[in-house]
Curated annotation (Swiss-Prot):
Record-given protein name: Probable carboxylesterase Culp3
Similarity comment: family membership: Belongs to the cutinase family.
Role summary: Shows weak esterase activity with the p-nitrophenol-linked aliphatic ester pNP-butyrate. Does not exhibit cutinase activity.
InterPro entries reported in the protein's UniProt record: AB_hydrolase_fold, Cutinase/axe, CUTINASE_1
Keyword entries, A-Z: Disulfide bond, Hydrolase, Secreted, Serine esterase, Signal
GO cellular component: extracellular region
Name of the gene: cut3
Organism: Mycobacterium tuberculosis (strain ATCC 25618 / H37Rv)
Length: 262
């Protein structure tokens, strides 16, 4: 388990499914990824994105994660660090709990070593499931791991997930997370069979359907949270429960099936 902050930039592609969907998505998505460490003068960026990649991707944050980070940088002009969640994003999807534990360990480390850094959590496809666990979203009757302790919730400024399978299994992160409800945006392309139930689904909706429309929209939402000026607290006190829901930024067609605030 990594306890030292690591800020990385990555690129790649990922996918997630169940049964026949898994094989098809992995075959269509699995591409190489290259990441390069980025150092900050004092080791603490203005904000940091902890992102979990999807099924079959090499270590890193994946193509969707990279597009999200790039858009966030462009919109804020801030120093944005990146931490890729360390877990085996395998086809059998047995390691989501490991990924959640790694993300939680890193959040705790950042709260201690960089208390003024605003933390952003994100995930795509199977990686969204990892963030569901961190956020305390129930995944049916199966327990995959423990959520982030409530004492650290205020250190997290925003959450953004894409192609989240939990939307097919009971609801969105933004509607079900007791820690991050109003801080979260959960985006599902309405042609994505991994998160959407209904006609018109195509594998391309999951693989190619999130860049740039949805990654830009998610970044715009996160920018609002980062500029809200909430000051991280030292762990120990119980954070205030999420309050009002922020209005979603507009997007170009095709409009995403946003599950924020539902």
């Amino acid at each position: 388990m990594n306890n030292r902050p690591i800020r990385l930039l990555t690129s790649g592609r990922a996918g997630l499914g169940a049964g026949a969907l898994i094989t098809a998505v992995v075959l269509l998505i699995a591409l190489g990824a290259v990441w390069t460490p980025v150092a900050f003068a004092d080791g603490c960026p203005d904000a940091e994105v902890t992102f979990a990649r999807g099924t079959g991707e090499p270590p890193g944050i994946g193509r969707v994660g990279q597009a999200f980070v790039d858009s966030l940088r462009q919109q804020t002009g801030m120093e944005i660090g990146v931490y890729p969640v360390n877990y085996a994003a395998s086809r059998l999807q047995l390691h989501g709990g490991d990924g959640a534990n790694d993300a939680i360990s890193h959040i705790k480390s950042m709260a201690s070593s960089c208390p003024n850094t605003k933390l952003v959590l994100g995930g795509y496809s199977q990686g969204a499931t990892v963030i569901d666990i961190v956020a305390g979203v129930p995944l049916g009757s199966i327990s995959f791991g423990s959520p982030l302790p409530a004492a650290y919730a205020d250190n997290v400024a925003a959450v953004a997930v894409f192609g989240n399978p939990s939307n097919r299994a009971g609801g969105s992160l933004s509607s079900l997370s007791p820690l991050f409800g109003s801080k979260a945006i959960d985006l599902c392309n309405p042609t994505d069979p991994i998160c959407h139930v209904g006609p018109g689904n195509e594998f391309s909706g999951h693989i190619d359907g999130y860049i740039p429309t949805y990654t830009t929209q998610a970044a715009s939402f996160v920018v609002q949270r980062l500029r809200a000026g909430s000051v991280p607290h030292l762990p120990g006190s119980v954070p205030q429960l999420p309050g009002s829901v922020l209005q979603m930024p507009g997007t170009a067609a095709p409009a995403p099936e946003s599950l924020h605030g539902r």
